[in-house]
UniProtKB/Swiss-Prot annotation:
Phylogenetic classification of the source organism: Bacteria, Bacillati, Actinomycetota, Actinomycetes, Bifidobacteriales
GO biological process, one term: rRNA processing
Keywords, ordered alphabetically: Cytoplasm, Endonuclease, Hydrolase, Metal-binding, Nuclease, Ribosome biogenesis, rRNA processing, Zinc
Cofactor notes: Binds 1 zinc ion.
Protein's organism: Bifidobacterium adolescentis (strain ATCC 15703 / DSM 20083 / NCTC 11814 / E194a)
Record's protein name: Endoribonuclease YbeY
Amino acid sequence: MSVEVTNETAWQIDGKIFSDLGVWVMSQMRVSTQSDLTIMFVDPDPIAQLHMRWMNLEGPTDVMSFPMDELRPGDGGTEMEGVLGDIVLCPWVAAQQALAAGHSTMEEMMLLTIHGILHLLGYDHVTPEQERQMFGLQRQLLLTFFALRQGAGARATLPAGTPDALAEWDREHAAGGKTAK
């Protein structure tokens, strides 16, 4: 399994943790060891552009998934092989959501990584039943990953004095009455 992590933000993020998480989740979902995944951290403007282009929705969002080979979870004896796809996350939006949820930005980004992988595997949350199944699975995966790592907590931080890119995005786009979602 190959997981490439790219950080195009000012956030200081330990890519190895996200690589380990991606490999672990793919193995739990019975994705082939020959499969590839890319996780990219971006600022509000790039994810807002992707959000508009692919979802026709304005403003930055937390995570977007771009499947490649449309792999699905393997059954008990079969592993799927191919390129799983790309996940794009915005730490700025994740930090805002983490604050509202009462946990760390790192925990939120790890949850969003799992959420993105599940989307790549065909999970969705359009109906209440789909939401219950997907959100339950992502929570179970995250808690199990935390338990296996025995609480080894890493942090996502910003260098002192880094401007708030999400607030800047909101200010730049406020003239049109649009703010981050």
